[in-house]
Amino acid sequence: MMNVSQDVSVGRALLTVLLATCLTSCSGDPGLYPDDVLRLELGLGDRDQVHRVVISGGDRESADPMETVIALGSYVEFVTADWLVHEIIFELDSLSIAARNFLERTDQVASPPLISQDSRYVVYFANGPPGRYPFVLEGNGAPGRGVVVVEAGP
């Protein structure tokens, strides 16, 4: 049988574990926080989620990861890993009419040529409809492909 001081100690330990679990789960994935450049240039903060897709070339253009699943209102940052020229172009013919209209209205259909290592192209899915957003990668090698999947929030 436990005495009162043991009950209090167990209660405090459980409360500490519960608070630690809640704080770490509520803070989000630290890998999705914007870096200093995005904070400065776009004014992003800890509540903004930025998913990074690394673009590289060679015989074939490639995106890593090839599929990126995001919540509505998130950002996707395409970053070049090499000094080759790359361009990201969303496939308008493969999009729903609403998704196509969203990308055209927000002028996010295609990136400018990304010509140096660590060049970035950021797409903001603030009011875009949920769904699949396939894209083509063009550059020095054979074209590559990828997709951004936007999921509706809770």
Where are each of the predicted segments found?
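N-terminal secretory signal peptides that target proteins for export/translocation
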Residues: 1-10
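C-terminal motif of bacterial Sec signal peptides marking the signal peptidase cleavage site
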Residues: 21-25
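N-terminal post-signal-peptidase region of extra-cytosolic proteins
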Residues: 58-66, 107-108, 118-121
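Extracellular/periplasmic metallocenter environments
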Residues: 27-42, 109-154
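N-terminal edge beta-strand
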Residues: 43-76
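Short, compositionally biased
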Residues: 89-106
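Beta-strand cores of secreted/periplasmic/IMS beta-sandwich domains, seen most often
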Residues: 66-89, 122-127
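Sec-dependent signal peptide recognition
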Residues: 10-16
